[in-house]
Amino acid sequence: MKQNIKKIYEIASVATICTALFKKGLKNQFIQGLSPLNKNISKMLGLAYTVRYIPAREDLNLIDVFKDPNHPQRVAVEECPRDYVLIFDSRKNPRAASAGSILITRLMVRGCAGVVTDGGFRDSHEIKNIN
């Protein structure tokens, strides 16, 4: 994101941005019902890098799939560009654990601007204390 654009978004309210998008014909460009784990962070800003989860088949989603370095979750964590926000679309299912403290810490170390999910996080008590 260009620095001049970023500065504009840093001072704009979410309502103002949503109204501007609405005027451009983009409706419902936000996820309802979200709340920050870390209440001390005032605003998160970055372009979106999105991962969409689909329901897992119990016969195919064995624990071994998570050892694969090409697993979509691992690839997303490693490919999410610096200063982007990683968005996990979990179909609003809180049982879909989008990530845990290890992957969130990895994203932070890699320079990710933040993480959003409409599902759940494992280790949320640890994630909220990551600085």
Task: Identify the meaning behind each predicted range.
Residues 1-131:
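Feature captures the catalytic cores and cofactor-binding loops of soluble hydro-lyases/lyases
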